[in-house]
Amino acid sequence: MAIATINMTRKEALLAELARDLPHAPARIPMPASDPALAKLNQLGTHLWLDTGNLEEASKLWRREMSALTTNNTLANQVVQTGLMDEVIQQTARRVREVEPGISEDDLVMDVVFVVNCHVALRLVSAFDALVSVELHPAVGHDIEKTVRYAQRYYAVNPDRFIVKIPLTPEGYCAVARARADGIPINYTLGFSARQNYLATLLSRPNYVNVFLGRLNAVVADNKLGDGKYVGEKTTLASQAAVRELRAAHPDIPTLQIAASMRNAQQMVDLAGVDVFTIPPKAVEEFYAQGHKPEEITSRLHEQYEVHLNDDADRSRIEVLWTIDDTFKKLTQDLANRGGVNLTGDDLRAADKDYGTKLFSDFTAEEQAEIRAKGKIPETARWTGRASLDDLMTESALQSFTTDQNAFDDRIRKIIASA
C-alpha cells in the first residue's frame, strides 16, 4: 500500500503550517490510573476510545486502557463556541488572505475549519499521545476528489496520530477506497447497518466502520415501533460478525468494528468483545460509578439479543439493519470485482438499483432539508416506501452534523469579518 505524499499549493502549505502551529500546547497528562474492568475489556479484544473533543473533560476520564479519542462536527463546534479558537480563527484568516487576497468567504471558511479541526485534535494528541479521529466538513461528503484531498491534507499534518473520518455516502465508499490506496487511515463513519459495513469492508477497506447503536434504539422507540431495546446492540454484533468473517477470508482487510453512539454503561458490558468502543463521557462516568468487576465482563460476541417490535411494525424494514442477504452479497462482490478506486457514486447507485437492494435513496435537496429539520431521529412513517431505514438514519446523521457545522461556520464568519 502506498503512503500518501501530496504536492501542496502555496495556500495548502500555509494551512498545513498553521495547522501544526499549536499555541499553548497542553502538557502531557501524568500517567493515568488503570481500571480493572476496562482492562478486562481490553483482554477481550476491545479497544477503548473516548468520544469527546473537550480536553478538560477527557482528562478526568482518561485511563491507561484507553487508546484514542474521537472528534466530530458537533464536538468541534462545542469547543469553538467557547471562544477557545477565536485567536486561531483570526490569525488563519489574515494569513490566508495575504496569500490569496481574492478568496471567497465560503472558501476561506473551509480553510479556517480545516485549521481549527486540526488544532482541536492536536491539543488532544499533545495531552494524551493518542490516536484522534478528525472529521471532514460535511459539504464535501458527495465529492470524491475533495474528500480525498482533505484526507491527504489531514494526514499530512499528523500521519502518526490522525485517523480521518469520512461520512458514509455513495461517493464516500469510493473516496475511502482511494484514500486507503494512499495508505491513509480511515474511520468510515455514520454507519447504521451490517450491510452498509459489509459493503464498506470488502469494497473500500477502511480501518474502521461504525454502527451508531444508540440512535437505532431511539428510532424504534421514538416512532413506537417497539420498545427500542437491543436494536443497536443486535445490529452492532451482526456487523461485527460480518467484518470478522471478511477479515478472516481476506488477510489484507484491516477493518475493525466500532460500537458508536453508546448511551449507557450497560451497553459497554453487553457488547464486550466488539473491536472498538467509542464512548461518550456520560457512559464512561456511569461505568466508573457502577464499579463493575472484571469477572462480570465476558465476551458477548455470540449473544443473540432479542428485539421486541410492535405487532403493527414492518419487521422487514427494521430487520434490514442486521441482515445481509445473498442478493446484497452478490452486489458487494460485483462492485468489489470492479474495484472501489475505479468507481463513482453514480456507479454504486446504478448497481444498487439493478440489484434491487435499496441501499441508496438519493434524497433531493428538499428532502434533505426536511430530514435536517427533524434532527438525528427521523419520523419513519414519512419515508415508508421511499427510503430504507439504514440509509434514512445515515442521511439524518449527516444532516444533523450539517446543522452543527453551520453553527461552527457561522461563528467563523463573524470572526473573520473583523480579522
Segments from the language model and where they lie:
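N- or domain-start disorder-to-order transition segments that initiate the globular core
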Residues: 2-53
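C-terminal extensions of enzymes
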Residues: 2-5, 318-419
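Short beta-strand/loop segments at the ligand-binding rim of alpha/beta enzyme cores
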Residues: 38-49, 158-163, 175, 180-188, ...
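Catalytic beta/alpha-barrel core
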Residues: 49-51, 113, 135-137, 160-169, ...
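Active-site beta->alpha loop and helix N-cap motifs at the rims of alpha/beta catalytic domains
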Residues: 65-68, 73-171, 176
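Conserved, mostly hydrophobic/aromatic
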Residues: 72, 134, 164, 179, ...
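Alpha-helix-loop-beta-strand connector modules within alpha/beta enzyme cores
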Residues: 120, 125-126, 156-157, 174-183, ...
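Catalytic alpha/beta core domains of metabolic enzymes, predominantly
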Residues: 187, 192-337
